[in-house]
């Protein structure tokens, strides 16, 4: 993760990408106790 105001957009994009991947894995395999409501 890159820190600083100039990198906020990149961090948001990376976080969104990670969230999408987590959501796919969790919703596909149903093994996501560490991420509440990930499939909502």
From Swiss-Prot:
Claim: Secreted is one of the keywords in the record: yes
N-terminal signal peptide: none
A GO term from the CC aspect: extracellular region
Modification Pyrrolidone carboxylic acid occurs at: 24
Keyword Cell cycle carried by entry: no
Single annotated GO MF: acetylcholine receptor inhibitor activity
Pro-sequence residue ranges: 1-23
Primary site of residence: secreted
Disulfide linkage: 26-32, 27-39
Assigned keywords, A-Z: Acetylcholine receptor inhibiting toxin, Amidation, Disulfide bond, Ion channel impairing toxin, Neurotoxin, Postsynaptic neurotoxin, Pyrrolidone carboxylic acid, Secreted, Toxin
UniProt xrefs under Pfam families: Toxin_8
Protein role: Alpha-conotoxins act on postsynaptic membranes, they bind to the nicotinic acetylcholine receptors (nAChR) and thus inhibit them.
Family: Belongs to the conotoxin A superfamily.
Comment block on domains: The cysteine framework is I (CC-C-C). Alpha4/6 pattern.
Record's protein name: Alpha-conotoxin-like Lp1.6b
Organism classification: Eukaryota, Metazoa, Spiralia, Lophotrochozoa, Mollusca
């Amino acid at each position: 993760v890159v820190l600083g105001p100039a990198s906020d957009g990149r961090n948001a994009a990376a976080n969104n990408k990670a969230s999408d991947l987590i959501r796919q894995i969790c919703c596909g395999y149903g093994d996501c106790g560490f991420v509440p409501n990930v499939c909502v």
